[in-house]
Amino acid sequence: MTRPPDLADSPPPEAQTPTRARPRYRPLPTADMPRILWADDEIDLLKPHVLFLEAKGYSVETVTNGADAVDRVADDRFDVVFLDEQMPGLGGLDALEQIKERRPETPVVMITKSEEEHLMEDAIGRKIADYLIKPVHPKQILLTCKRLLDGDRIRGEQVQQDYLQAFGQLSARLGGPLAHDEWIDVYKQLVRFDLDLEGGDESVRQILDDQYKGANEAFARFIEERYPEWITAARDSEKPGESRPMLSHDIIGESVMPLLGDVGGTPERPVVFFLIDCLRYDQWLLFERTLQQHFEVETDWHYSILPTATPYSRNAIFGGLLPMDLARRFPDRFTADVRDDDEPSLNAHEDAFLRDLLDRRHRKDIRMRYEKISTASDGAAFADRVTDLLQVDLSAVVVNFVDILAHSRSDSRVLREIAPDVPAYRGLSTTWFEHSWLSDAFRQLAEHDCTVVITSDHGAVRSLNATKVIGDRETSTSLRYKHGRNLKVDGREAIFVKEPEDYGLPRAGINENYIFATEDRYFVYPTNYHKYQERYRDSFLHGGVSLEEVLLPVATLRPTR
């Protein structure tokens, strides 16, 4: 046995090579260092890689065979396992399977000399975290470690940095005049940062929340100033463009009818129009991630008409008319005296409105069908026969679940606990969609030659601040908008509509006014003010003026098959 050299065996200082590099400092492992297990029968040849990782702050343990790797993983916890595919005895793939049985959460990186595709597919099928081809460079190993262990942190820090850099630009835009299409760009940026910063630094999120609040304040002023001009232009038959955006009553004419072919022609393929009630843009972006697996998605935008409530915006969509014109054309089907936006009868004639719109604006021989789905059992039955929609030229499908979720959260303590804030509410609706009959229906439609159009009638805003309103007993009951006689409200906290016709709205009588809550406010009467303030606080509501309620996507989907 060779005795290790001691100090007495060392050559005198003058005999040592003066230019010899000192050994690199090798930090001692600490409890907070990421731990790596590396299994390779030629691990001695990879010593420079190990030293490089240790110098970068990783604790690396090495073994020379798959069996030892499995034993070490069973005995201890590692943050990453590097596994050579070709080792004597227990091979890499077999070791991978046993490691995953013991520690399914541990990321395993397969390293191999083989470039055969079936080996890659086999390893990927067994849920490896990465696949590297020898020879590997130390920095390649480091990059893999950073991606697996620090990826979320690095991405989060980068998003925060990007937002803080964009903050000044956004603030400058919000401080100046914006056109209707520029407001859409600002809103898209805010929503993207909202999604990307989810779970990040709370101080940065607070900055974003404050900027969101400022944006909604400016947006309300913009709507109050410009909306009557848009209504005038629309009633003068001016098409959406620079002077006005696409509004609710334009959607069928602008985004659906062109897909049905020219007047007198035949549609190239069936069109299925989905209206998902109360769907916000941030929710849509998460739904879209699932749909992009099956469809090419092209997104346009529309502004919901006011009030952003189902009896107005959804009837306008299917009728192709502003509410005041709808009331004149269908006095027995659309009343100007709307008192409760939750009353199903207020939207009982959407199929008749759509048929009338097609007859007026396109042609009478369009074959259409209409369905409204409000329960899970109705949805399951719909998914079972969804391909029947392809037997006609145009199908219109109203999906009420997201709206029901928003209203149910207001009344359910359990739902409030499950979805206590906007990100959780978003996540809850996304989880539903991914596992729903609706997602199944879209997958089936993606297998056929058809075009799908998806939009919403309005969004919803998390309402946290009450504002007092005074009205008589005949005043409508909605929390984000009201209409009645001689309404009184603080003009700094709502939009007051003295002349309903200026907003394209029907007038039920003399001195009839409308008011729309702005930002995150909701209306409460002075009587029992604190009781109802507390009762309705932190509800997702609609009917008023906010970016979340008004700005809505119109998506056209074509199967990728």
Task: State the predicted function of each range.
Residues D94, E115-D130:
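Alpha4 helix (beta4-alpha4-beta5 surface) of REC/receiver domains from two-component response regulators
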Residues H118, V136-C145:
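C-terminal output helix
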Residues R3-T17, Q86, E121, G151-R561:
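Feature captures the catalytic ectodomains and active-site-proximal regions of enzymes
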Residues T64-D68, G91-D94:
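Acidic catalytic/metal-coordinating carboxylates
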Residues I43-E61:
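Two-component/phosphorelay signaling modules centered on CheY-like receiver
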Residues R77-F82:
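Active-site beta3 strand of CheY-like receiver
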Residues D71, L93-P104:
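Short amphipathic alpha-helix used as the core "switch/output" element in two-component signaling
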